[in-house]
């Protein structure tokens, strides 16, 4: 068995976990989901879902990974009791991570494309619809993203992924603070913040609740083993409740900042906050094109977007790489080559899905991106979280006592006895109910 790699510091662990969580889910998907689902109402439900569902599942995932000292492909097998078959869910984790990269790498390429356009001053001659329909642009930038990710991952854990993520996360936070402060100077800042932060309870319904839960899991990257792999890279000197809280606070801080950057700009320039996936492309690009010094503000904006998206690409690809290496025994370089080629080929479905590989899986206007997102956000993330909750808290799985003993090992915030009903009953029941409701109300056609 290969000796397990280790992260060099607690800061590296928190930054790497937060980097995996912070990404397109926070700075691309969260703002347009918030805009489409009532602004402040969605924000309130999202934060509640983070606290009562996201935090418990993250603690469970860290605990299982650290106890098993394995990637998701084997972590259930190492902790399950003789004769059980929980290990089958490790394969689902691998499928979910690959499906996520089938569209996430393409979206990261879009962001990189916009960054290059603003940096070179050619930001006025392109639009989102034209870009996604251009096969050459999509394939080229997808290739750049995948190659960059797996070249970085080919180095050892501390010298490659951990070091790069620390620098990227620091730069990301600095850039976001600068952009948020600038956005607060807009004439429509007060109106934008009111929409974003003040709940309108009349807009809360079942669809919004399901959207908030799916977004919470998507944003935190829990349910697919992304956090478990980082848990397997750390020692037992810190209790996991506190570590999870740090990651979620950082993740939420970035999501809130993203809205502060975007919504004041939308209300200042009279732009539609319900624009959907194009909100951060056509909408924000339009804002910068009409703003004094807009080229440079746009460059900074899409630079922070690149850092955010690439941090998640690196984290998820590390998870895929770890699982494949455990299955095959390959070295890091060989695993990176094979995984990189495989993800690139699969992601071509999304990259070409608006042109030569057009595919409409659901309602009119849907494409490959929606198909992969449906698999991940609507299925693998909630079902993976449900399986994890049942495994950790049920006598049929690892069991509550073993889970708590692992989670509470080390210094810091610990699980308390009063939390047992929340973890054991509320979390799995809430996830199951919301999942079934979401499937029943999904816009299939």
PLM ranges: what are they?
Residues 1-29, 57-62, 66-88, 235-239, ...:
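Membrane-interface "cap" regions at the ends of multi-pass membrane proteins
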Residues 2-3, 7, 162, 166-310, ...:
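Membrane-embedded translocation segments of transport machinery
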Residues 3-5, 32-37, 67-92, 105-160, ...:
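Inter-helical loop and helix-membrane interface segments of multi-pass membrane transporters/permeases
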Residues 6-17, 42-45, 84-98, 141-145, ...:
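Select transmembrane alpha-helical segments in multipass membrane proteins
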Residues 11-49, 225-231, 241-245, 249-252, ...:
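Transmembrane helix-boundary motif of multi-pass solute transporters/channels
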Residues 33-37, 88-97, 144-168, 229-237, ...:
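Membrane-water interface regions at transmembrane-helix termini and the short interhelical loops
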Residues 310-315, 336-354, 370-405:
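Hydrophobic alpha-helical segments of multi-pass membrane transport proteins
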Residues 361-362, 367-392, 412-445:
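A generic transmembrane alpha-helix motif of multi-pass inner-membrane proteins
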């Amino acid at each position: 068995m290969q000796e397990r790699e280790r992260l060099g510091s607690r800061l590296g662990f928190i930054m790497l976990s937060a980097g995996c969580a912070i990404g397109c889910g926070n700075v691309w998907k969260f703002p347009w989901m918030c805009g489409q689902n009532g602004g402040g109402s969605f924000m309130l439900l999202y934060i509640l879902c983070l606290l009562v569902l996201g935090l418990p599942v993250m603690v469970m995932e860290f605990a299982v990974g650290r106890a098993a000292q394995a990637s998701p492909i084997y972590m259930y097998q190492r902790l399950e009791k003789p004769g059980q078959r929980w290990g089958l869910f490790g394969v689902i984790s691998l499928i979910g991570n690959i499906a996520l990269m089938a569209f996430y790498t393409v979206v990261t390429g879009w962001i990189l494309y916009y960054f290059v356009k603003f940096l070179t001053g050619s930001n006025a001659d392109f639009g989102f619809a034209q870009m996604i329909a251009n096969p050459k642009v999509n394939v080229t930038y997808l290739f750049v993203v995948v190659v960059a990710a797996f070249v970085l991952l080919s180095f050892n854990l501390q010298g490659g992924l951990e070091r790069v993520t620390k620098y990227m996360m620091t730069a990301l936070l600095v850039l976001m603070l600068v952009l948020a402060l600038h956005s607060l100077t807009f004439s429509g800042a007060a109106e934008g913040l009111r929409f974003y932060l003040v709940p309108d309870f009349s807009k809360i319904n079942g669809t919004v609740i399901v959207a908030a839960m799916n977004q919470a899991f998507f944003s935190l990257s829990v349910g697919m083993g992304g956090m478990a792999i980082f848990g397997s890279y750390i020692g037992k000197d810190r209790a996991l409740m506190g570590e999870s809280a740090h990651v979620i606070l950082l993740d939420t801080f970035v999501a809130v900042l993203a809205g502060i950057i975007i919504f004041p700009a939308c209300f200042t320039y009279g732009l539609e906050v319900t624009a959907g996936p194009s909100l951060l492309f056509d909408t924000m690009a339009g804002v910068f094109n009409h703003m004094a010094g807009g080229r440079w503000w746009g460059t900074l904006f899409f630079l922070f977007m690149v850092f955010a998206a690439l941090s998640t690409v690196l984290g998820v690809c590390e998870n895929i790489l770890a699982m494949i290496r455990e299955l095959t025994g390959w070295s890091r370089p060989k695993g990176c080559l094979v995984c990189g080629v495989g993800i690139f080929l699969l992601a071509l479905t999304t990259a070409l899905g608006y042109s030569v590989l057009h595919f409409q899986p659901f309602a009119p206007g849907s494409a490959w991106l929606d198909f992969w997102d449906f698999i991940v956000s609507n299925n693998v993330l909630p079902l993976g979280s449900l399986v994890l909750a049942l495994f950790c808290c049920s006598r049929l799985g690892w069991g509550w006592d073993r889970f708590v003993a692992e989670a509470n090992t080390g210094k810091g915030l610990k699980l308390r006895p009063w939390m047992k009903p929340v973890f054991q009953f509320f979390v799995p029941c809430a996830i199951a109910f919301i999942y079934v409701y979401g499937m029943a109300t999904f816009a299939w056609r």
